[in-house]
A protein has these predicted regions:
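Transmembrane helix-loop-helix hairpins at the membrane interface
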Residues: 128-237
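Alpha-helical transmembrane segments in multi-pass membrane proteins
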Residues: 13-67, 119-123
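Residue-level signature of transmembrane alpha-helical entry/exit and packing/kink sites
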Residues: 6, 10-15, 44-52, 81-89, ...
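Short, Lys/Arg-rich, polar N-terminal cytosolic tail immediately upstream
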Residues: 1-8, 71
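Membrane-helix interface segments in multi-pass membrane proteins
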Residues: 25-50, 105-114, 182, 186, ...
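Juxtamembrane helix-loop-helix connectors linking adjacent transmembrane helices
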Residues: 37-44, 70-140
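Structural signal for membrane-spanning alpha-helices in multi-pass inner-membrane proteins
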Residues: 26, 30, 59-64, 97, ...
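Alpha-helical transmembrane segments
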Residues: 10-25, 87-95, 167-171
Length: 237
């Protein structure tokens, strides 16, 4: 049996391997920033995001190529129903975020941001606008490619779709732990935000399981992140 067939026949092994290798490759690619002619904090931020995303994409595309599944990346043009679904889910998620942030602030409950929004806290508010754009073209596409298009999809043949959604959401959430700790070292705040990230991942995973394509989860993921960053900029965070 060839390497390709051995890997393809083990959905769990492939999913775990990709889930671990993706963030490692992303961090490895990010280290290349020291060799790039970045002029300031904004260009360094953009380079870091792009390089990390390139690492995720390299692992995801590499695995699909190795297993003969590159055809899975062919985008499916969404129909009117899917467009309405994307718009509705994005609106609900953003509204839920607003309610949660206001509610936690009123109750005085701390929660963690991440290493990206920490730049805005450091006086670079314009970075939020940059991140809004990067969410649409880099962050959401590469994360959804890896965690939904590869990890979750690889589990469909070995377990139920519901379990695949949950299983793929675990490494997605854990991959965000370092960025959450970059904003605060308070364990309870990090834990609360980690639960929120896990919840978001469940929604993205549900969309993939429903549509069998990464277009819908990518659109919702990117739209949600973009709108949140824009709202943070508008309120002066």
């Amino acid at each position: 049996m060839s390497v390709r067939h051995r890997i393809a026949s083990s959905g769990v092994f492939g999913a775990v391997t990709v889930a671990v290798a993706g963030p490692i490759a992303g961090l490895g690619f990010s280290r290349l920033i020291g060799h790039l002619p970045t002029a300031g904090p904004l260009s360094r931020l953009a380079a870091a995001v792009v390089l990390y995303g390139a690492g995720l994409a390299a692992v995801g595309v590499g695995y699909l190529a190795l297993t003969g599944r590159l055809g899975d990346l062919r985008p499916v043009r969404p129909d009117a129903e899917e467009v309405r679904l994307v718009a509705a889910v994005t609106a609900v998620l953003v509204l839920a975020w607003v309610v949660a942030v206001v509610g936690l602030a009123v109750l005085g409950v701390p929660f963690a941001g991440n290493a990206l929004t920490a730049q805005a806290d450091g006086g670079f508010r314009i970075s939020l606008v940059l991140l809004a754009g990067l969410s649409l073209v880099v962050i959401a596409p590469t994360e959804e490619l890896l965690y939904r298009g590869v990890v979750q999809a690889s589990l469909y043949d070995v377990t139920s779709r519901r379990r695949a959604v949950v299983a793929a959401s675990v490494p997605f959430a854990l991959a965000h732990v370092p960025t959450l700790y970059a904003d605060t070292s308070e364990p309870s705040a990090v834990g609360l935000s980690l639960i929120a990230v896990f919840g978001l991942s469940l929604v993205f995973g549900w969309l993939h399981a429903r549509t069998d394509d990464i277009v819908a989860p990518t659109a919702v993921h990117g739209g949600y992140n973009c709108l949140v960053f824009c709202l943070l900029y508008l309120v002066g965070v």
